[in-house]
Amino acid sequence: VHSHIDHLFALMQMAKDRGLERVYIHAFLDGRDVSPTSGVDYVTRTVEKCRELGVGKIATLMGRYYAMDRDKRWDRVEAAYDAMVYGESAHVNPLPVAAVKDAYAAGVTDEFIEPVICDGDGTISDNDSVIFFNYRPDRAREITRTLVDPKFDGFTRQYFPVTFVCTTEYDLSLIHI
């Protein structure tokens, strides 16, 4: 409904074909439109594809409850933003698959996994490029706005120019993408 893992793999292949070396993935786990514990399979497949291609690392992972809010619950969105931009979270695990399994062991399903830092070098920073391949605008607007809108005021954050590409129009007011 929101995206497909084959699109991620095609983007990773494109990055490899273009010789990109610093490719980081910020994984948003679903748990609503698919099984609430299917995230471990997607994360496993992604880690395997990174190894196979020799490109890409999972920098962060989190449930859609944080990254894909649509009701201006800025505390949730800020937690996602802080993980992706500042590399800050109460949860750090360099092994993405283990991070998901740890959440399951604690009774937390994909949708509600709090942001986890898997690779602190993968933060989004000045002049980075971001490809957001979510196809449902309603769940993508808020996190997008935090990254591209200089007038965003939902919480205090550092604004910096990011080249941001998305796969559909999220909002006519988001003129920076």
Regions found by a protein language model. Give the residues of each.
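Structural beta-sheet core signal
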Residues: 25-27, 132, 164-166
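S-adenosyl-L-methionine-dependent methyltransferase catalytic core, i.e., the SAM/SAH-binding region
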Residues: 152-155, 163-167, 171-173
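Glycine-rich, histidine-containing beta strand-loop boundary motifs that form or position
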Residues: 27-29, 62, 168
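Conserved small/polar residues in nucleotide/adenosyl-binding loops
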Residues: 175-177
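Long, well-ordered, tryptophan-enriched scaffold segments
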Residues: 34-126, 131-132, 137-161
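Short loop/turn segments at secondary-structure transitions that flank enzyme active sites
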Residues: 31, 138-139, 170-171
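Active-site histidine-anchored catalytic micro-motif
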Residues: 1-45
